[in-house]
């Protein structure tokens, strides 16, 4: 695998577990974010167990397990307790990464930090992009939560919105020693999904061509591969 391909994380958004192996072993990427909240059977134990069997595939990519709640425009409609239990079972099944929202209390975050999985703490703003100071305060808050990687995604309405978000990557590294993924969603923010890699983000999120995007503005796997080749990354 080339360095450029290792920077690409494919987002698996699918109601069915059929053909899961093809996406977990998809060529030309380095990771898969599995949006388990999109699964039709996520609210039942058997449905989740059937899906998690895919984590036993020997040749799969590392997986970032995500069960996004409705409050962050995710598909999980059960109780918060049930959602956390689903995440715990996903870690026990062998997911290498777990994505957790930054509004979770410490007593929920702590067991995940102590688990075998690495933790992404994420913050999403689907309404817009705050000013620079509130964004930096948000990074400061995320950095206190003990994650391996911080993630901030806001919705861009102007080109300048992207610049404020992208500057969080070197800011977080310099101030807190934190690896940070920071980009903007939406049509105006699309280019930041490439630029964040050039600024030092460890990976960026793309969609599989056959599947829906997990957030507005995502490139396909092939599009991001081409863009990385054009700019000479990796």
Swiss-Prot record:
GO molecular function, a single term: 3-dehydroquinate dehydratase activity
Record-linked SUPFAM superfamilies: Aldolase (SSF51569)
Keyword field: Amino-acid biosynthesis, Aromatic amino acid biosynthesis, Lyase, Schiff base
EC number: 4.2.1.10
Active site: 124 (proton donor/acceptor), 151 (schiff-base intermediate with substrate)
InterPro entries: Aldolase_TIM, DHquinase_I, Type-I_3-dehydroquinase
Domain of life the protein comes from: Bacteria
Biochemical pathway: Metabolic intermediate biosynthesis; chorismate biosynthesis; chorismate from D-erythrose 4-phosphate and phosphoenolpyruvate: step 3/7
Record-annotated membrane-spanning stretches: none
A biological-process GO annotation: aromatic amino acid family biosynthetic process
One Pfam family per UniProt: DHquinase_I
Enzyme class: lyase
Swiss-Prot/TrEMBL catalytic activity: 3-dehydroquinate = 3-dehydroshikimate + H2O
Protein task: Involved in the third step of the chorismate pathway, which leads to the biosynthesis of aromatic amino acids. Catalyzes the cis-dehydration of 3-dehydroquinate (DHQ) and introduces the first double bond of the aromatic ring to yield 3-dehydroshikimate.
Subunit structure: Homodimer.
Name this polypeptide is given: 3-dehydroquinate dehydratase
């Amino acid at each position: 695998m080339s360095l450029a391909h290792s920077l690409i994380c494919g987002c698996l958004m699918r109601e069915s577990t059929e053909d899961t192996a093809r996406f977990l072993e998809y060529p030309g990427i380095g990771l898969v974010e599995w949006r388990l909240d999109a699964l039709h059977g996520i609210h039942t134990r058997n449905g989740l167990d059937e899906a998690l069997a895919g984590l036993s595939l020997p040749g799969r990519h590392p997986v970032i397990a995500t069960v996004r709640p409705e409050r962050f425009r995710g598909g999980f409609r059960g109780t918060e307790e049930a959602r956390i239990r689903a995440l715990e079972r996903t870690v026990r099944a062998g997911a290498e990464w777990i994505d957790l929202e930054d509004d979770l209390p410490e007593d929920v975050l702590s067991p995940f930090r102590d688990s075998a999985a690495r933790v992404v703490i994420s913050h999403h703003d689907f309404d817009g992009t705050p000013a620079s100071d509130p964004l930096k305060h948000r990074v400061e808050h995320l950095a206190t939560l003990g994650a391996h990687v911080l993630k901030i995604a806001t919705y861009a309405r102007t080109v300048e919105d992207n610049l404020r978000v992208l500057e969080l990557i070197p800011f977080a590294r310099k101030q807190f020693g934190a690896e940070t993924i920071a980009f903007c969603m939406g049509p105006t923010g699309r280019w930041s999904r490439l630029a964040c890699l050039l600024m030092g983000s460890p990976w960026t999120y793309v969609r599989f061509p056959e599947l829906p995007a997990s957030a507005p503005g995502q490139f396909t796997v092939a599009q991001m591969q081409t863009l990385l080749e054009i700019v000479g990354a990796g």
